[in-house]
Amino acid sequence: MKKQILFLFLVLGLIYITACAPAQQPQPTAPKQEPVAQPKQTVTQPTATIQPKTEISAEVQELFDKSKTRVKSIKYKYKGPETGDQFYDFFIKDTKIRYNPYLAIKTLDKQDSYDSIFIDKTAKTAASYCLAAYCAYKGKKQDLGYSDAYIPTVFDWITGLTKAAKIGEEVIDSRSTWKVDTSKGILWVDAFYGIPLKGESSGKSYRFQQLSVNVVQDSDVVPS
């Protein structure tokens, strides 16, 4: 009987000890680290410069090339948007240009009166002069803005074209010309010298008359 009572107390003691023992806490674990997204690297590709496609027929190019071998200098009368209803006299040799604007007032008796514009394409300079015998005050008058004073020449019209094709033939000023559709407009190009006698572009007309080839001297285009 005593053994049974002792065993009972032993069992009760074990139950009490178990009930009073602190519950085992789970071990904390480190939070799971999410992978850091790397910023996307943008590779900038170099931009290729697209050159305009040149479409100039072989026969027209051969016509334009005549101006390089047959025209060393030239003088002509020009009428265009810059001149109104009047003609300007042009003299061209190499990179030197002189043109004489139309003078509504023929007297050149003022200090700032001028009758000629001289242009140097290489130096990009322009200046006004009074050279006529009846100039009261001869010599240089003032420097001018190059872009303001410059008027495209017969050579400029056939330079830097990206398109040119023959569309016909006509006679202008008793000279045979090719009618050529170009990226700058319609040109009537002298069949022998390869330079335009007429041009039409954006509804405007340009005329080059009384051409004289290879007669211009340095003294005509360089102020003295």
Predicted segments, located by residue:
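Acidic, serine/threonine-rich low-complexity disordered tracts
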Residues: 81-85, 172-178, 193-224
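Bacterial N-terminal signal peptides
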Residues: 9-17
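Extended beta-strand-rich segments in extracellular/periplasmic secretory proteins, especially
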Residues: 137-140, 148-201
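An acidic-aromatic
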Residues: 85-150, 193-210
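Positively charged n-region of N-terminal signal peptides that target proteins for export
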Residues: 1-4
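N-terminal leader/targeting segments and the immediate start of mature chains
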Residues: 20-97, 133, 138-141, 218-224
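Short, exposed beta-strand/loop patches in secreted or surface proteins that constitute
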Residues: 64-68, 87-93, 117-119, 163-171, ...
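Short, hydrophobic/aromatic-rich segments at coil-to-beta transitions
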Residues: 68-77, 93-105, 172-181, 192-198
